[in-house]
Amino acid sequence: MPNTPQESMEDVSIAYMQGLCAYNGYTLSIERRDNDGVDITIKCKGYPSTTSGCLKYSPTLDIQLKSSFARFKQKRNGDITFILESKNYNNLVIGDRMTPIILVVLHMDRDRKKWVKHSKSALKVTKCA
């Protein structure tokens, strides 16, 4: 039986982040259990780059991933808001975390056939994070 649309969206969001990490030379670890609002962790060996502005050696970043096509609202000025459950928000705003955490939201198209396109010359993930 195929994955549900939500499970597939989660897989696409992980693949999207994996592609960005691979391109930039970072490692991505998928958390086995989401007990603390963390879905993936990104690590960099050494200093990220001279232009990144990061002055820390071997930085680590925890990420809570979300993917949706329905929980977005676009404001008149073009800004986009995302409806986030309070428990997820509360996990993100804890001030004394050892490792910083951010929310990454992949905006999916309603048409599942448009999520990922592949051919001999390209692999394309549509919409944006």
Q: What are the roles of these predicted feature ranges?
A:
Residues M1-D36, I42-A129:
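Mixed-charge (Asp/Glu-Lys/Arg
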